[in-house]
A protein has these predicted regions:
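Conserved PLP-binding catalytic core of the aspartate aminotransferase-like
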Residues: 274-275, 288-324
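N-terminal small-domain helix-loop-helix segment of the aminotransferase-like
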Residues: 1-76, 84, 133, 261, ...
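Conserved PLP-anchoring active-site segment centered on the Schiff-base-forming lysine
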Residues: 88-110
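Helix C-cap/helix->beta junction micro-motif
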Residues: 8, 113, 172-173, 288, ...
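Active-site phosphate-binding strand-loop segment of PLP-dependent enzymes
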Residues: 122-191
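A short helix-loop-beta submotif of the ANL/AMP-binding
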Residues: 111-118
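PLP-dependent enzyme catalytic core of the Aspartate aminotransferase-like
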Residues: 135-136, 311, 319-328, 334-368
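PLP-dependent aminotransferase class I/II
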Residues: 205-297
Length: 368
């Protein structure tokens, strides 16, 4: 879809590349680190300034206290953290529950490791947790749950009440909980991001995964992190080292500078900015006759595109690109069992001029 979008000169709202401006302190410190010679391998768990900055950030924003020496692992992106943790803690044949719609990387990682993903659908429309469905999906082979909050692709933000219910089941069945909190600062309309590890009884069983790719608009730098009980960190760190060695050294320094130097207002202002972007794209989708499911967080919108010609979501995506010049992802990428054929995902992490152009194209103005 990206290649075809480039060919026709359209606007790419398919990829979650986040091409907004990188905060100046992050860029400056990374460049300095390169010139200072910080271009070789780091410790497998990352440089001390970044681990310490992550620990301070977690205490301030997530109300989670961790030891930067024994409970923080800098990873080559959040996805690398998930891969290493799955390698370390799960076995072929284990079952792991994903909430649907899901992020495709989670599903494909489990499949690659011969672990069985079990999809538990969230309620259509408002994406509420169906506790009965979740309870029914747990079997003697269930080893873990994956919670992506705020979520890609639907912007689901799990409420504290929902997470407490999940935590109770995790305790009852002795399950790991893998979180993906990469969009933690992209939460709208006064909602609260709750880190599952902060709930009673969850610290030891939760593998908390996040990163700075989205927050600092550095998706190509591959800087993520993982926190967990020291009991699990040795094995997780071993598999991350075996697979990735370490996250890029100079980019670790740049990321640490961002965490240390940027004020709290940076994060609140960013949430307000992205809420405005969300409102802009949702308004354009409504005007185009494509009904959006307004996201509570993250920076994607799932929209009902049943009015577009085409028998499948991929055909509808091609129709939209051909007729309106806007690229989106087929909804079937986020569902099992043939669901999602009438859905497309749009990413609104774009510069304002690009997003405005996409909205104009969706409305039928200025077609390519």
């Amino acid at each position: 879809m990206t290649v075809e979008c480039d060919r026709v000169g359209g606007v790419n709202l398919a990829q979650g590349v986040c091409d907004t401006e990188v905060p100046p302190p992050v860029v400056r410190r990374a460049i300095e680190a390169i010139h200072e010679g910080n271009n070789i391998y780091t410790r497998l768990d990352g440089i001390a300034p970044l681990r310490e900055a992550i620990a301070r950030k977690l205490e301030r924003d997530n109300h989670l206290t961790v030891d930067p020496e024994s409970e923080v692992l800098v990873t080559s992106g959040a996805t690398a953290g998930f891969y290493a943790a799955a390698l370390a803690l799960l076995d072929p044949g284990d079952e792991v529950i994903l909430f649907e719609p899901f992020y495709g990387y989670h599903l494909n990682t489990l499949l690659a490791l011969r672990i069985k993903p079990v999809a538990v659908p969230l309620a259509d429309g408002n994406w509420a947790l169906d506790l009965d469905r979740l309870r029914a999906a747990i079997t003697p082979k269930t080893r873990a749950l994956v919670i992506n909050t705020p979520g890609n692709p639907c912007g689901k933000v799990f409420s504290r009440t929902e997470l407490e219910a999940v935590a109770a089941l995790a305790e009852e069945h002795d399950l790991f909980v893998f979180t993906d909190e990469i969009y933690e600062y992209f939460v709208f309309d006064g909602r609260e991001h709750v880190s599952p590890a902060t709930l009673p009884g969850m610290a030891e069983r939760t593998i908390s995964i996040s990163g700075l790719s989205k927050t600092f608009s550095i998706t190509g730098w591959r800087i993520g992190y993982l926190t967990a009980n020291p009991r699990w960190m040795g094995a997780i760190g071993y598999f991350h080292d075996l697979t990735y060695v370490c996250a890029p050294s100079p980019f670790q320094y740049g990321s640490a500078a961002g965490l240390m130097e940027l004020p709290v207002s940076f994060y609140t202002d960013m949430a307000a900015e992205y809420q405005a972007k969300r409102d802009l794209i949702c308004s354009a989708l409504v005007d185009a006759g494509l009904t959006p499911s307004v996201p509570a967080g993250a920076y994607y919108v799932l929209a009902d595109v049943s009015s577009l010609p085409g028998a499948t979501a991929k055909e509808k995506a091609r129709t939209l690109l051909r007729e309106r010049g806007v690229a989106a992802v087929a909804g079937t990428a986020f569902f099992t069992g043939g669901r999602g054929e009438n859905l497309l995902r749009f990413c609104f992490a774009k510069r304002d001029d690009d997003l405005k152009r996409a909205c104009d194209l969706l409305r039928g103005a200025g077609r390519v």
